[in-house]
Amino acid sequence: MIWRRAALAGTRLVWSRSGSAGWLDRAAGAAGAAAAAASGMESNTSSSLENLATAPVNQIQETISDNCVVIFSKTSCSYCTMAKKLFHDMNVNYKVVELDLLEYGNQFQDALYKMTGERTVPRIFVNGTFIGGATDTHRLHKEGKLLPLVHQCYLKKSKRKEFQ
């Protein structure tokens, strides 16, 4: 996936439309397959529609497993800004997926709803586990539980690198 750092936003990452790989292309490929299926050009309609439905979930799961901290956000959301600032202030690297900048952001938000039970943003994952929104994340931080979760992930990733 191709991501570009936003200069004024610290470690905030946004989708770069100049890249040819990533969620937009994969989701567009699934949407194209579904359109072909609907027009009769595809012989296996049900599998094409399944691909369309599972593409966002697969991309979300891949992003979550590849990064210790992932924040699914919207650029205009004050709670999202608050959550990103918390991780920035803790000097923790994180990946942000700005749903409102993605062409298929609504499908990703629908997939996040199915995974977490909420449509609101931010949706925050640490060490592969959904921890909640901004309020939940701040509570974990105040209780002293957030940083240990992050460190646990970094330790796990460094051990994997040792054995590769």
Curated annotation (Swiss-Prot):
Keywords: 2Fe-2S, Disulfide bond, Electron transport, Glutathionylation, Iron, Iron-sulfur, Metal-binding, Mitochondrion, Nucleus, Phosphoprotein, Redox-active center, Transit peptide, Transport
Residues where [2Fe-2S] cluster binds: 68, 153
Activity regulation, free text: The 2Fe-2S present in the homodimer leads to inactivation of the enzyme. The 2Fe-2S may serve as a redox sensor: the presence of one-electron oxidants or reductants leading to the loss of the 2Fe-2S cluster, subsequent monomerization and activation of the enzyme. Unlike other glutaredoxins, it is not inhibited by oxidation of structural Cys residues.
Residue span of the annotated presequence: 1-19
GO molecular function annotations of the record: 2 iron, 2 sulfur cluster binding; arsenate reductase (glutaredoxin) activity; electron transfer activity; glutathione disulfide oxidoreductase activity; metal ion binding; protein disulfide isomerase activity; protein-disulfide reductase activity
CDD domains reported for this sequence: GRX_GRXh_1_2_like
Binding positions (glutathione): 74, 109, 121
Pfam families: Glutaredoxin (PF00462)
Modified residues (S-glutathionyl cysteine): 77
Disulfide bonds: 77-80
Source domain of life: Eukaryota
GO term, biological process aspect, one: response to redox state
Keyword Transport on entry: yes
Domain Glutaredoxin: from-to ranges: 57-157
GO cellular-component term (any): intracellular membrane-bounded organelle
Tissue and organ expression note: Widely expressed. Expressed in brain, heart, skeletal muscle, colon, thymus, spleen, kidney, liver, small intestine, placenta and lung. Not expressed in peripheral blood leukocytes.
Record PTM Phosphoserine, positions in chain: 20
Family to which the UniProt record says this protein belongs: Belongs to the glutaredoxin family.
Note: The absence of GLRX2 dramatically sensitizes cells to cell death induced by doxorubicin/adriamycin and phenylarsine oxide.
Purpose of the protein: Glutathione-dependent oxidoreductase that facilitates the maintenance of mitochondrial redox homeostasis upon induction of apoptosis by oxidative stress. Involved in response to hydrogen peroxide and regulation of apoptosis caused by oxidative stress. Acts as a very efficient catalyst of monothiol reactions because of its high affinity for protein glutathione-mixed disulfides. Can receive electrons not only from glutathione (GSH), but also from thioredoxin reductase supporting both monothiol and dithiol reactions.
Protein name: Glutaredoxin-2, mitochondrial
Native source species: Homo sapiens
